[in-house]
């Protein structure tokens, strides 16, 4: 009888403890394993969208006009409900248009594409320096709220990725305050057991990107460790699984990684290790690079951690950084992207992170890109004539099927499906 009473009390205590946390017990997406998720910036604006941020992320040094822009890929906006006339012209002399991430219809279009092409979901990016007040916080909250609705509508997984870039010393308190704000105001992870927030290891997953980079950041491992501890252990807002975004050479303290050995102790507190590979190799150099993934995975297994590598379709940021060549890492009809996808799977990766869904700034976007970009003083990367504008959405969906063994593994890139 005493044993039975003790067991009942223990169950009640556990139930009370869980009830104090502000998360639903589960989700329609119970694990990152078997999924291909993309990063989602959602940071583009237009002067008339109501956000008060001008041509945010389209402009360069305060100007948006031919010869002055931050983007290298021009998005195809033919399927968007709302678009905005830009100062750029197409080859026939007509006006070129753009979309705003602030519009719910733009976010809805993106999630509809994810469903149509089989992209499993996204991590909505949240730069802590951009969400402290005013227009920045409002924009990011609106985009996240719209993404939550569209993720549910189209049954796509969704999570949040805090990007610590630009955070100052002691900025962990800002992350903690912001997480509480989102949990209380949006009920991010408390939308019922059929919600589409991504869970992992039985807990809602949150990502914290920018830990261990050796690029003169004002914050350090102490702030990162406090954020991880809070997200995992706080009695009310914690109880989360944590993905940490780290440098490429995190494991052996290479050129992009700070040399403090405590880094590995901090990373062991997380649940998933996610190294950033964008710009580290091109197609020719990937074969020599990708064995690193299998060594990373072995380390993670030894330390009871999961691992997700980055894959990206190409890279170009000439308009943002004119000294860099345009089309710096060519897509090569999808061969570069597919080489990384097959390399990661062969190395033992059981989940993938795509950089990025919508980042036209650095030419890594997988969304539909214009085959007829503006002409003039600014130059834009365009896909090859025989490659359709939706090819990278298609490849991303196919990668998910291959990762889950729903289709046979194939080294050769699947050919485009022309409509």
Predicted regions and their residues:
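Glycan-processing catalytic domains of CAZymes
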Residues: 21-419
